[in-house]
From Swiss-Prot:
Record-given protein name: Protein YwpG
Organism: Bacillus subtilis (strain 168)
Membrane topology annotation: Peripheral membrane protein
Induction behaviour: Only expressed during growth in minimal medium.
Subunit structure, as described in the record: Interacts with both the D1 and D2 domains of dynamin-like protein DynA.
Residues in coiled coil: none
Length: 127
């Protein structure tokens, strides 16, 4: 089976290296599948995963204002990436990896987790 990795995190459709941030603040921290992302409540974020051979890409989009989570699958056809059918995406291995990873959102020190198919955040200050 082909391995995949988190290639990029996009905020509001802009790649992280293009996103204007303060130099003192860590934008994305990766250590053993733990990612720290600085995002406000109005933000939209996309996680782009890619297989090791570069033949497939998976995009998981999270919209905080709409409280929506969506999934897109792309396959390389020799000249470009083509969007594939994404039925039953909740059972795909990439989605399980996304769920197993931990994402911390700065601001109110919220940790994002998914439960019952909906995005939830837990305020660490409230317990």
């Amino acid at each position: 089976m082909n391995q995949f990795r988190l290639k990029e995190i996009y905020i509001d459709g802009v790649p992280s290296e293009s996103h204007l941030i303060q130099k003192e603040v860590t934008y994305m921290l990766s250590r053993k599948e733990v990612f720290e992302v600085h995002l406000n409540k109005k933000g939209r974020i996309s996680f782009l995963y890619e297989t090791q051979d570069g033949m497939e890409q998976y995009k998981i989009k999270l919209s905080m204002p709409e409280k929506k989570l969506s999934f897109q699958w792309f396959a390389w056809d020799g000249s470009s990436y083509v969007r594939m059918n994404t039925q039953n995406w909740l059972t795909k291995q990439i989605f399980f990896r996304f769920l197993k990873s931990t994402y911390f959102f700065k601001g109110k020190k919220q940790k994002m987790f998914l439960a019952e198919g909906k995005m939830k955040t837990k305020d660490k200050n409230r317990g």
